[in-house]
Amino acid sequence: KVSFSVGEVTGNGKWSAKDDKFSLTIEGEEMVGTIGENNISFDDMLGMGVKVIFAKEGTDAMDPARYLTKEEKVVIGEWAAESVEELLGDGPQTSMEGVENISDALRLNFKDDRNVAVVYKGEEIGTFPWSVAMGYCMIESENPSLSVTINDDDTLKVDYSDDEDYYTFHCVKSDSK
C-alpha cells in the first residue's frame, strides 16, 4: 500500500517493482517509473506531462542540481547588464544614472539550488527562488518584479520593476565563474 500527497491533494494505492520498473497505482491511475540508483523517476506523473523524481533521503540523489534541465543549465551562473532601456526611452543605453558601470545596474547570480541573488544599482535586493519553462525564467519576487526571457543567443532580457523604476535590461553571462 502507498499513501500519496501533493499539497492538499491525497490518494491511496498500491505499488510493485520488477527489474528496473516501479509500478504505482493511485486512485485507479497507473504509472510506471524507472528505478535508478537511490531514486525512482516517472516521466509522465499522473498523465500531467510532468517528470517527477523521488530520491532516497540522505543520499546524493537528494541534490536538486543533479536534475537540472538544459534550459536551467543555461541560466546557472553570474549575469550582468550590458545595456538598459527605459519604458519610454530612446532605445538601449550603456549608461545609467546611479551607477558608474552599466554592469552594476543589474546583476543576477543563478545558483544550482534554484535560488538567484539579485543586485540592483550596486545594492543586494535579495535572494529569490527561480524556475525555467519554455524559454522564460520565473523569479518568485513581487517587489521587485523580474521577468526574464532567455534569448536564442544565450543572453537574457530582464524586465525589472519596483515602486519607482521600470527598466528592460539586456544581460550577458559574466566571464568569471
Predicted features along the sequence, with ranges:
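Lipid interaction determinants
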Residues: 1-129, 133-177
